[in-house]
């Protein structure tokens, strides 16, 4: 039985996600697999590539042939160079930067809060603005009445 290491497609229409599987060469793309040895998510930045190196080396050693895309992935992870005995076995896999922890984010927010100036509010309070509007409204009818009396004379 000829065995291939190939990709099976998962995911949504515009968000492909693949599993790296070992399967009989005669099975269809998403057909029955002998073993799953990794996963590949090309839409993430950088692309998520996880390969069980030990199992990949085993299957390559017993004669499984990788497809072209899987061979490229194995070259990135360094498994292909390790199998062939070539230099540069560390590969060119880019690793995603670690997200800051909640504690680090909290400490940064505290430091930023301490650096802010401590003074009075710049904007006026709403109560004063309402009181001024009420005074202006009370003055307006009195002025209008005074003008109408002056016009009558």
Swiss-Prot record:
Residues 137-153 have a biased composition (Low complexity). It comes from the Bacteria. Residues 114-153 are annotated as: Disordered. Signal peptide: none annotated. Pfam families: Ribosomal_S16. GO terms for molecular function: structural constituent of ribosome. Keywords: Ribonucleoprotein, Ribosomal protein. One of its GO terms (biological process) is translation. Gene3D superfamilies: 3.30.1320.10. InterPro entries: Ribosomal_bS16 (IPR000307), Ribosomal_bS16_CS (IPR020592), Ribosomal_bS16_dom_sf (IPR023803). GO terms for cellular component: cytoplasm; small ribosomal subunit. Belongs to the bacterial ribosomal protein bS16 family. NCBIfam families: PRK14520.1, S16. This is Small ribosomal subunit protein bS16. It comes from Rhodococcus opacus (strain B4).
């Amino acid at each position: 039985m000829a065995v291939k290491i190939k990709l099976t497609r998962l995911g949504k229409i515009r968000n492909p996600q693949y599993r790296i599987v070992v399967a009989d060469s005669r099975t269809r793309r998403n057909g029955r697999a002998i073993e799953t040895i990794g996963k590949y998510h090309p839409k993430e930045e950088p692309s998520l590539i996880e390969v069980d190196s030990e199992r990949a080396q085993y299957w390559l050693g017993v004669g499984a042939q990788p497809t072209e895309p899987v061979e490229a992935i194995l070259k990135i992870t360094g498994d292909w160079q390790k199998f062939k005995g070539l230099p540069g076995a560390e590969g060119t896999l880019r690793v995603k930067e670690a997200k800051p922890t909640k504690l680090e984010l909290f400490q940064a927010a505290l430091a930023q809060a301490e650096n802010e100036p401590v003074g009075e509010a710049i904007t006026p309070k709403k109560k004063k603005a309402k009181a001024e509007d009420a005074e202006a409204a009370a003055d307006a009818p009195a002025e209008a009445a005074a003008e109408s009396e002056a016009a009558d004379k």
